[in-house]
């Protein structure tokens, strides 16, 4: 393997480690890397790690961890790492490095550079196997020396100096791999192999799971600085030279001293290095690692323990490396050493897990997940070494510390608690107690017990973890709290607080860094000691033999790890997991993984139970109340806390944790632990807020988390997921909710469906939009990976997560595509309405596909999708509409709310089905009204159905999605995708996305372009015009409104929802731009339909085709007119919607070139469609939608808009030319017609513009023609059914064609109906006759004071809207016409901008006029229908009704009132009069 020395060297050299090799820091990125960067090379490596991809780093770490080639990486550095517990032991023992698997997982968990990789553990496994083979085949010392003897040892010397250099590098490494590397001084090489074995055994015993490596380094740091202060260490230093050469004879104590002396005085010899590798933990209090792992099974690397660095540096300024500042410490991944059987009594159990020190945390889990099996030979060798080292230590000055030897040798079943030598001769029991206290603290910390504050007391109270029993049960608590506290307090009093950067990442407030604080709290170090001591106690019940590093540890560990809170403020520090920057439960949090004392104690499955059961009285006496509470909170949530039963669960937990880490690709243990801590805190406060990432979630503890969105089991349960969502929704903790929601969302992807629904915008919304969720997204990513590799949480981060991302992108897509579309297919009719309205169906798949934006929301959305996908999504859409307001109104609760309240979610994330439907509602305030969610299904009035064509053959409504699908597909712009068959869209996530995009475009272009005029015109008036308007061609631009369409429909939808909300709630926003027409449409009583028409007509024909009959009003006038006005306004006036349309139309024209053949036939109809779109608004759109519905509509919109802009720019060139022409008469008509034609084209389902757009030439001709002199109108006027001629006339004869247009629009509605606007025909016939001239003329007149008469054609378009949806569309058309009129002259455009708010009112007025034109009975019926619909909607969605929906309903009602008030006014109103009346109406 590369991990072998030669390959490793090459690899290191070839990779970031070239510089590292120079310094001898072999493994910078690897949390578990054999050697952490300990020199400037570490800086370089760290910097490179920063730049390196996480996968690269992970590979590096895996390679280094797999091959603890201290040789390549400066044996000394690596040895030091090992000394500090980075590795299990010497090269042989470095099979422990195959902890590296755990370390790899730990590294991931630690959030180090190690990238989330599902192969990380396999890598480590392979490396472990290779390492075992090599270790078995080669002498431990020789192999290690061979690997890095020449360069590594010397570089180690250099590294020791460079450790000072590392200060800067360490700072950077700490930031990057701080979790991975314990920035600490390189550990002095071990004295002898035996010492190494003993130290490694103790270290492994004490060593936390791989993530715990860092605590080891910390321990090493702590102990090394302490070593000089330790008298025993002096002996060790004296012996160190011997041990350097004599791997087997020198005592661990000698090694400990030797380590510093080697570091300080001479370059350590290979043997020294190997010994140090074996005994590196001698200096390091293993508790630290245990703490790291305890707190977080893999946290120790997280804890890389800058705190330890600080402590060690502080405590260890005597050593060469200790001298450098905290950042300078060796950035060695503290590879938690898996204690070998000889080393750890629990090694037997750990044997499976091979997690000696990790056994506590990682060993149990590792047995399942990371079966780090150290070769028996190595194990035996380690045992022998441990025994020899223990014997030597026993005979050494640190004889009390040597006490571990019996445990190492005599109590292999139990992790021998590394009895830290008391700096001042504290009893080994006392030392053990600290360690155990650490375990207790770890469990408590993990348990989330309130160890953070009052940690001193807490630790004292905790000192005896309920499961861990000190040798002297009654004495231990007090002793631990006292004696441990004494040395630790003394020791920590000198220790600098943990570097702020340590906590910067995790937001954990920097606290006086107390090495043992985290480890104590996390029971990392103490856990090891506890495991050893407790195990020994349980088996031998003798004070855990003081570890050779007990002196170092004692000062730190005796007081620090296990010391309750040496610092009075240890509590806070404990809270931040001193070592780990992760607030995750700070070491407490890991306890859920069984990483706490649970795991540590668990290594010997019986011991923890015995310890807990027996020592519980003593240890529990103090800590039990607290620890029991905390553990009860955590342990239950965890897989059983620190009890015996937890041992396997801990192991499973660790395994699960590591697996989860790998699967979910947690970038760092810290991230994972962060999630865990949050989850733990959540769980402690509320069991609901359990983090799926916690191993418990994966372990049997899931039942507790069943309501937890992060539960992997529940994850697979759609309904449970939904329940979880609801539970999360109910969960009061906002942060837990987002995390739960996000994890829940991720679980939804796991479920495959729930995500879409719960989160409507879950797809793109969550992580990308929500950073807080992004963390959860990563967590869910991993969670998803672990729980269900298929779709982790839909999330950009998921995409980043590689396999997880792929799964989300692909698997999620297919599940969403298959599941959501299939379910949507089940409710296709409803979904079609809903999707057409809210592009819910279309969006559902699309959101699933595009989970980036609403990934945070997505997880809930996915769950909702799962639960509500088929019929529920729609049914739930109604309930979402009603409920979504509540659950979705809060974004964080979105996951929970998603399932119920898509409306709210749509606001937040519109990606999901329910959210899509609600998104449409949000998008088009009218959409809410248009689509009254009844029983979760959008109850659309006839208009609504017409919008979708649902009434017209449920699919023609989705023509935009379906018919335009080919065009859109051909169109190639965002629209082509959107123009997917509704069925296809429903069937495929992409298709659904396309349909959703198509609907979005309709909504956005027609309604949202106007509505989004708020958003898009301002953000992207020109680009937004083309982009947003030309949804198909400029998907991103449509994505401005529908940018999410590209990024994620959800994302787009959310903006759309916001804009819609703005528009519906703030028509003025819509009025801000020509989108006022869409806004007016929204404001119109037709808002119910307006949702689609604004969105649909704007979106082009998606709405129109769907609801051609109903759509005309909405589509043509609302969309087209608004766009037309927007085009002109956008172009000349700053009416971004108009410009958008102009641009969009132009783009459409460009696109139609390909589409021209198809649009060629509709070209003649395009004019008619324009007129129809103007007059009917829906009439034109319907046929074009079928022909080239969505993409064409979108394209046509782009084309129409662009030509409009081209014409606007050419003729208008600010729309002046066209608008001026319209003003002039022919030109005025041309301008308005151009705007209207284009708008109509876009609006009227590409009636002329879109038909032309789709038919390329028509759009191009119509739009370009319209540009100059309504030549577009000429092309458009080329009536499909002779309507185009009238359109031409209208274009050329501005006033006459205006009237003609009105008439033509009426005729066109029919003609276009015949062509594409067949549905519009009936609508036109229904509405057009009454509305066309009067309504259109009035709006035009009111709109363009100078050129309003010529612009009557535009008002005609409005009439078309009125005809299609007289109540809603006419206002939109009026606005469009007004906007066009205003736009035609720049002055007028300015005027139109001014009237924008009035135009909205005018729109209402136009609508009123149209209604007036309509027969009184018909108008009354319409109004009654609208009111009924509003009442229905309000009833259905009143309680949780979305604000947008409510605003839309209110606006609709207001519009109805204004319409009725305006109705008396004859349709023929002076423009000024009409505008004032509109203003009055609107006001």
From Swiss-Prot:
Coiled-coil zones: 1408-1438
- According to the record, the residues making up region (Disordered) are 135-268, 306-334, 383-506, 518-653, 680-911, 949-976, 1013-1061, 1089-1299, 1454-1483
Spell out the Basic and acidic residues composition-biased ranges: 609-621, 680-689, 740-749
- Is Metal-binding included in the keywords of this UniProt record? no
Q: Which residues cross the membrane?
A: none
Q: Where is the composition biased (Polar residues)?
A: 157-170, 252-264, 596-607, 622-640, 699-710, 841-876, 1096-1109, 1116-1125, 1188-1202, 1258-1276
- Which residue stretches does the UniProt record annotate as biased composition, category Low complexity? 141-153, 190-206, 220-251, 424-449, 474-483, 529-541, 754-774, 894-909, 1148-1158, 1204-1226, 1233-1251, 1284-1299
Domain of life (superkingdom)? Viruses
Which keywords has UniProt assigned to this entry?
A: Coiled coil
Query: What is the protein's given name?
Result: Protein ORF C
Species in which this protein is naturally found: Elephantid herpesvirus 1 (isolate Asian elephant/Berlin/Kiba/1998)
């Amino acid at each position: 393997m590369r991990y072998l020395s030669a390959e490793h060297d090459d690899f290191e050299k070839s990779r970031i480690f070239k510089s590292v090799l120079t310094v001898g820091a072999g493994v910078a990125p690897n949390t578990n890397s054999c050697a952490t960067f300990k020199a400037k090379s570490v800086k370089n490596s760290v910097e490179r790690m920063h730049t390196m991809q996480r996968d690269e780093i992970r590979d590096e770490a895996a390679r280094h961890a797999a091959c603890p080639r201290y040789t390549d990486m400066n044996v000394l550095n690596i040895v030091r790492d090992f000394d500090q517990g980075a590795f299990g032991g010497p090269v042989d023992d470095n099979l422990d490095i195959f902890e590296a698997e755990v370390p790899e997982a730990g590294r991931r968990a630690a959030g180090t550079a190690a990238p989330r990789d599902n192969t990380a553990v396999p890598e480590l496994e392979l490396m472990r196997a290779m390492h075992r083979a090599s270790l078995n085949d080669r002498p431990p010392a020789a192999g290690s020396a061979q690997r890095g003897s020449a360069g590594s040892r010397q570089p180690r010397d250099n590294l020791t100096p460079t450790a000072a250099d590392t200060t800067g590098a360490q700072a950077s490494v700490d930031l990057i791999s701080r979790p991975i590397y314990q920035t600490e001084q390189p550990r002095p090489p071990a004295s002898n192999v035996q010492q190494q074995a003993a130290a490694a055994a103790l270290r492994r015993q004490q060593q936390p799971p791989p993530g715990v490596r860092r605590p080891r380094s910390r321990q090493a740091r702590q102990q090394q600085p302490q070593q000089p202060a330790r008298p025993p260490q002096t002996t060790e230093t004296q012996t160190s030279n011997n041990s350097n050469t004599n791997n087997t004879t020198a005592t661990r104590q000698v090694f400990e001293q030797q380590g510093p002396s080697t570091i300080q005085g001479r370059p350590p010899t290979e043997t020294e290095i190997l010994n140090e590798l074996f005994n590196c933990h001698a200096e390091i209090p293993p508790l630290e690692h245990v703490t790291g792992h305890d707190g977080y099974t893999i946290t120790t690397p997280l804890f890389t323990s800058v705190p330890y660095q600080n402590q060690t540096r502080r405590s260890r300024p005597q050593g060469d490396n200790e001298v450098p500042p905290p950042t300078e410490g060796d950035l060695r991944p503290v590879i938690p050493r898996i204690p070998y059987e000889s080393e750890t009594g629990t090694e037997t159990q750990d044997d499976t897990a091979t997690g000696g020190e990790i056994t506590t945390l990682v060993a149990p889990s590792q047995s399942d997940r990371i079966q780090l099996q150290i070769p028996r030979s190595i194990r035996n060798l380690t045992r022998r070494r441990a025994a020899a080292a223990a014997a030597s230590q026993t005979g050494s000055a640190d004889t009390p510390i040597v006490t571990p030897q019996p445990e190492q040798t005599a109590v292999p079943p139990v992790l021998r608690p590394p009895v830290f030598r008391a700096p001042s001769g504290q009893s080994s029991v006392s030392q053990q107690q600290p360690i155990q206290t650490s375990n207790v603290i770890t469990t408590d910390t993990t348990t989330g017990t309130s160890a953070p504050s009052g940690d001193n007391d807490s630790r004292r109270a905790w000192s005896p973890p309920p499961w861990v029993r000190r040798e002297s049960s009654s004495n231990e608590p007090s002793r631990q709290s006292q004696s441990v506290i004494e040395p630790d307090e003394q020791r920590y009093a000198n220790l600098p607080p943990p570097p702020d950067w340590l906590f910067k990442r995790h937001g954990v407030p920097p606290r006086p860094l107390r090495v043992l604080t985290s480890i104590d709290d996390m029971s990392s170090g103490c856990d090891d000691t506890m495991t050893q001591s407790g195990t020994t106690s349980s088996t031998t019940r003798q004070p855990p033999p003081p570890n050779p590093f007990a002196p170092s540890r004692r000062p730190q560990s005796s007081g620090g790890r296990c010391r309750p809170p040496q610092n009075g403020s240890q509590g806070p520090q404990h809270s931040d997991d001193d070592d780990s920057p992760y607030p995750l439960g700070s070491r407490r949090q890991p306890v859920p993984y069984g990483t706490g004392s649970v795991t540590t104690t668990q290594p010997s499955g019986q011991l923890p139970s015995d310890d807990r059961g027996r020592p519980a009285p003593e240890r529990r006496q103090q800590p039990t109340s607290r620890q029991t509470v905390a553990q009860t909170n955590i342990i239950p949530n965890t897989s059983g806390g620190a009890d015996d039963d937890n041992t396997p669960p801990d192991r499973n937990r660790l395994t699960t944790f590591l697996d989860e880490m790998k699967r979910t690709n947690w970038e760092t243990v810290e991230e994972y632990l962060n999630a865990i801590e949050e989850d733990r805190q959540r769980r402690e406060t509320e069991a609901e807020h359990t983090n799926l990432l916690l191993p418990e979630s994966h372990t049997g503890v899931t039942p507790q988390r069943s309501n937890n969105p992060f539960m992997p089991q529940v994850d697979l349960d759609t309904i449970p997921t939904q329940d979880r969502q609801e539970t999360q929704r109910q969960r009061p903790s906002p942060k837990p909710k987002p995390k739960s929601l996000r994890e829940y969302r991720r679980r939804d992807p796991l479920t495959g469906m729930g995500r879409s629904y719960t989160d409507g915008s879950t797809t793109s919304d969550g992580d990308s939009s929500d950073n807080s969720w992004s963390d959860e997204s990563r967590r869910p990513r991993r969670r998803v990976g672990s729980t269900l590799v298929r779709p982790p949480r839909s999330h950009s981060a998921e995409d980043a997560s590689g396999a997880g991302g792929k799964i989300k992108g692909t698997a999620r897509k297919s599940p969403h595509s298959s599941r959501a579309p299939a379910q949507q297919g089940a409710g296709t009719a409803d979904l079609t309405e809903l999707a057409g309205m809210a592009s819910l169906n279309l969006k559902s798949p699309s959101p699933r596909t595009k989970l980036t934006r609403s990934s945070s929301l997505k997880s809930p959305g996915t769950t909702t999708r799962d639960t509500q996908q088929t019929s529920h999504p729609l049914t739930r859409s109604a309930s979402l509409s009603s409920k979504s307001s509540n659950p979705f109104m809060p974004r964080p609760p979105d996951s929970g709310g998603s399932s119920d309240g898509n409306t709210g979610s749509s606001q937040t994330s519109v990606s999901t089905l329910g959210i899509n439907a609600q998104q449409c509602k949000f998008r088009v305030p009218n959409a809410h009204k248009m689509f009254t969610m009844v029983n979760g299904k959008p109850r659309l009035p006839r208009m609504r159905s017409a919008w979708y064509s649902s009434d017209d053959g449920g699919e023609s409504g989705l023509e935009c999605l379906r018919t335009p699908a080919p065009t859109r597909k051909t169109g190639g712009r965002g629209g082509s995708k959107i123009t997917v068959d509704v069925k296809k869209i429903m069937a495929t996530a992409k298709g659904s996305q396309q349909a959703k995009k198509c609907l979005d475009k309709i909504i956005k272009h027609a309604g949202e372009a106007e509505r989004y005029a708020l958003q898009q015109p301002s953000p992207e008036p020109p680009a937004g015009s083309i982009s947003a308007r030309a949804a198909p061609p400029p998907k991103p631009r449509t994505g401005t409104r529908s940018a999410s369409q590209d990024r994620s429909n959800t994302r787009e939808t959310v903006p759309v929802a916001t804009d819609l909300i703005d528009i519906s709630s703030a028509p003025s926003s819509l009025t801000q731009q020509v989108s006022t027409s869409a806004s007016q449409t929204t404001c119109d009583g037709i808002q119910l339909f307006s949702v689609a028409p604004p969105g649909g007509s704007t979106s082009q024909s998606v709405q129109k085709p769907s609801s051609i009959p109903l759509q005309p009003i909405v589509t043509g006038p609302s969309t087209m007119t608004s766009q037309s006005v927007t085009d002109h306004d956008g172009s000349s006036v700053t009416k971004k919607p108009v410009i958008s349309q102009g641009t969009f139309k132009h783009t459409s024209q460009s696109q139609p070139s390909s589409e021209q053949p198809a649009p060629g036939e509709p070209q003649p109809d395009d004019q008619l469609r324009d007129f129809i779109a103007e007059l009917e608004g829906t009439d034109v759109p319907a046929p074009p939608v079928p022909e080239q519905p969505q993409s064409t509509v979108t394209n046509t919109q782009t084309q129409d808009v662009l030509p409009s802009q081209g014409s606007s720019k050419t003729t208008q060139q600010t729309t002046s030319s066209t608008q001026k022409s319209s003003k002039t008469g022919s030109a005025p008509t041309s301008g308005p017609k151009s705007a209207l034609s284009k708008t109509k084209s876009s609006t009227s389902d590409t009636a002329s513009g879109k038909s032309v757009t789709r038919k390329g030439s028509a759009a191009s001709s119509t739009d370009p023609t319209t540009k100059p002199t309504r030549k577009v109108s000429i092309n458009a006027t080329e009536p499909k059914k002779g309507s185009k001629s009238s359109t031409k006339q209208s274009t050329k004869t501005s006033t006459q064609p205006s009237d003609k247009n009105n008439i033509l629009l009426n005729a066109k509605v029919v003609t276009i109906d015949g062509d594409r606007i067949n549905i519009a025909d009936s609508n036109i016939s229904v509405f057009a006759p009454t509305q066309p001239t009067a309504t259109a003329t009035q709006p035009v007149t009111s709109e363009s004071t100078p050129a309003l008469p010529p612009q009557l054609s535009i008002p005609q378009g409005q009439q078309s809207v009125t005809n299609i949806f007289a109540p809603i569309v006419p206002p939109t058309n009026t606005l469009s016409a007004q906007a066009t009129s205003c736009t035609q002259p720049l002055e007028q455009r300015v005027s139109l901008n001014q009237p924008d708010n009035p135009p909205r009112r005018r729109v209402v007025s136009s609508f009123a006029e149209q209604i007036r034109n309509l027969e009184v009975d018909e108008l009354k019926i319409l109004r009654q229908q609208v009111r009924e619909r509003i009442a229905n909607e309000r009833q259905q969605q009143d309680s949780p009704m979305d604000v947008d929906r409510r605003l839309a309903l209110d606006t609709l009602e207001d519009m109805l009132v204004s319409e009725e008030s305006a109705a008396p006014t004859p349709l023929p109103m002076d423009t000024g009069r009409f505008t004032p009346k509109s203003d009055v109406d609107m006001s």
